């Protein structure tokens, strides 16, 4: 059903890839041999944390008397009282447990299970689904690029829209949790802290700040990943399949968007991953090792993505069997091969809804009904020839990743112009926003327009008359 093919990589000078605190040295890929590109533009993470619980179905309601400004909150804030946390002692009461990456956690699966027993109303069993926490972030200081902060705001809104529609919690971080682990390493301390703060979440979904969710109907196929603990966009044939005569590539997978299970395996994995980062006394040596291992790596630093590929390549790797390399759909897709096709994708989706017998797809509905209506549209894709994803298909790309564009710093990959990045982001953001605005009866006046216009009744059938 899903198919994708890799496209090639362009070398990015390290000096163009390093923002003061947030950038990544990922190679950005024009269409040639390795598919999606790899910049990490999001990192900077948590001290000051904005936790967006927009339409969060998992947040318990406060008692009626606590929803007013003058309410007595004594019962809710009994200092140091286990009763305030549900009446049973949990791992949160252990002073030895730390949120920081320099202090390993053991027995995490049992700790999570104990917490779930103490809070059955918040457990996965109570929800009936595996809960997902999306984590993203940007630097704590204002952007250096004119308009960069506004672009980050739109990118944040895009993630908040998707999470609201699908009942996913969103954690957006704007400060470093560990000053030594900045730029592309900053996400590891954030994810570690998020796992501890959200034991109810089965999965943590890291999404770089420069990634746009461009299919608001698509839901993560979590059943596909049973038996795995880490899902990244990549190709097994490229990660593992290089022969002695072919060079390994650090761009054979993308570490800018991934799913990681909230479990002990993942904590151990991140400890091993971080051991190749700037906190390690072997950091310089790891940079040399990784540069030697990957002929297409042009900078000397040890980065998260090269380290991840290297970990998977080692003989007897304890990690490989639990890592799912997703290439069946645009888990994250290279923006240069996507943005020019968005207009044609819109036309094909509208044509699908104008087909005989498709009136139910056009029917107006409340935003709260998004999931069943999205499922109906997804079910109709095959009949309209839109089921195939990737560069050869016309299904909406799930995630469009603007690697190399650096919207905050403005230090773009030298192969891109500011106009191409800015216009591409506006197209992708408006493309996604139109899917959201439809429930409100509007759409953008054009793919690059900030203006909106009302939709006629029975759109898009009425629009063609």
Protein language model regions, located:
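Short coil/turn segments at secondary-structure boundaries
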Residues: 146-153, 175, 217-220, 270-273, ...
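N-terminal anchoring/stem segment of glycosyltransferases
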Residues: 2-4, 8-12, 16-17, 23-202, ...
